[in-house]
Amino acid sequence: MASSMGRFLLFFIALRGFLLEASGDFGSGASRDDDVLLPYSRARARLARDCTRVHAGRLEHHESWPPAAQTAGAHRPSVRTFVSYFADRAVPGHLTRAPEPLRTFSVLEPGGPGGCASKRRATVEETARPSGCTVAQNGGFFRMETGECLGNVVSGGRRVSSAGGLQNAQFGIRRDGTLVTGYLSEEEVLDTENPFVQLLSGVVWLIRNGSIYINESQAAECEETQETGSFNRFVNVISARTAVGHDRKGQLVLLHVDGQTEQRGINLWEMAEFLLKQDVVNAINLDGGGSATFVLNGTLASYPSDHCQDNMWRCPRRVSTVVCVHEPRCQPPDCSGHGTCMEGRCQCTGHFWRGAACDKLDCGPANCSQHGLCTETGCRCEAGWTGSNCSEECPLGWYGPGCQSPCKCEHQCPCDPQTGNCSVNWSPTLSSLFSRVKECFPPPEVTVQAEELSLLTRTTWLAITLALAFLLLISTAANVSLFLGSRAARRRHLDGAYVYHPLQEVNGEHPAAEKEQLGDSSNPFKD
């Protein structure tokens, strides 16, 4: 009997232990969600929204802070623990500063990607550990009953929750590192030219451009709810609080304050004044009360106000989004597909990708000379232009983009460098002047062959010319020689250097005088 009772007792203890462990009843499981601090009553829940929705247009109710210059080696966050007095109340908390927010700050969905879509809730530790957060706090508001993420949430460039234009305080970082605080229209949230890479919604804009902005924020976020008293109580009650903002150096600032609603902690006015003393320029209030949680290096470092299932202990609440400070990361992580992430910085591949995210094409100062498009392989020239910077007109005989097409005109005459039209009528340039005098030039390959043929022709003609010149020289010399010989002979005749031979002697006849003398001597009758 005693042994059976003992076995039953052991079984009962084991069963109770299993059930308690399954339900987290030993002080390390789920909280009771008993320290609830809501800006609006549960009945209203702002389903229809008491304030104005803004879908289009650009509001003037936000502040943009340019990204701070990158400093080598200044990547690790600074975490300060404090115990300060507010109206004679000792209040502990943590203040975190993180340089280069674009690369060191992220908004995380509960339990990882897809958490908002599945309306998941998880403790800050559960969300922060897989993401390698050095510092993590709870983020935006959510519905306690359903786990639905409220307001705008952009995590790593992905929009996972929409406020639908509802005007609550926002804090986000755009792709170029600009810090944005305030109220945004739906159009501004959806901007694609410089989109948000991180964004979350809070309630109440605490500090705007170095001044407390709580009164204006109450009027802007919800006028009618002030009449119920719930929103006014949310602002003025002491409780655990969290906030996010930035200082004048462009560093991200996270504030966490321990407390319990109506018993310990601070109100929003006290939190705003404290942040002003820390040189904070813009800041918004995030979820507080039992949601306020601070995790350092993956370990809970705050005192939650929610009770565990066993009232002896306090347990961290399962919340929605988480704000995370981590080691520098490339933004986006894949460097837009055009680079490699090394020590938090994108090393761009190729010769023309530039920018912190390797998302900008840069073909040099000339920018393709306004005659082409910069691509990842260089300038793609418009029709009629060529060269590495698209600064050269097409040579005669070529046309089209990059001057890749030969003209198809007769005799390889020039064509329009843009259209290839053989009726040349482009603006007067050196090329057109050549065309006007009908000088047609073939493509470069034909020109080379023509030059070789021309060289051969010139050589042949030179040889022929030299031969003819030589023959002419010989002929001239011969003619000169003959001429000089004839002239010498003529001179000899003129000088008397000759013998007279009568023609009769040559013919065997006597001259007439001699005949007469011979006749007289033989005639006896001649007197």
Curated annotation (Swiss-Prot):
Glycosylated. Contains complex N-linked oligosaccharides with appreciable amounts of sialic acid. Residues 485-527 are cytoplasmic. Residues 359-391 form the EGF-like domain. It holds the Pfam family NAGPA. One of its GO terms (biological process) is secretion of lysosomal enzymes. Coiled coil: none annotated. Pathway: Protein modification; protein glycosylation. The chain crosses the membrane at residues 464-484. A motif (Tyrosine-based internalization motif) lies at residues 500-503. GO terms for molecular function: N-acetylglucosamine-1-phosphodiester alpha-N-acetylglucosaminidase activity. It is found in: Golgi apparatus, Golgi stack membrane; Golgi apparatus, trans-Golgi network. InterPro entries: EGF-like_dom (IPR000742), NAGPA (IPR018711). The keyword Cytoplasm does not apply. Disulfide bonds join 116-149, 133-324, 308-315, 363-374, 381-390. It catalyses: N(4)-[6-(N-acetyl-alpha-D-glucosaminyl-1-phospho)-alpha-D-mannosyl-(1->2)-alpha-D-mannosyl-(glycan)]-L-asparaginyl-[protein] + H2O = N(4)-[6-phospho-alpha-D-mannosyl-(1->2)-alpha-D-mannosyl-(glycan)]-L-asparaginyl-[protein] + N-acetyl-D-glucosamine + H(+). Residues 498-505 are annotated as: Mediates the interaction with AP4M1. Homotetramer arranged as two disulfide-linked homodimers. Interacts with AP4M1. This is N-acetylglucosamine-1-phosphodiester alpha-N-acetylglucosaminidase. It comes from Bos taurus (Bovine). The gene is NAGPA.
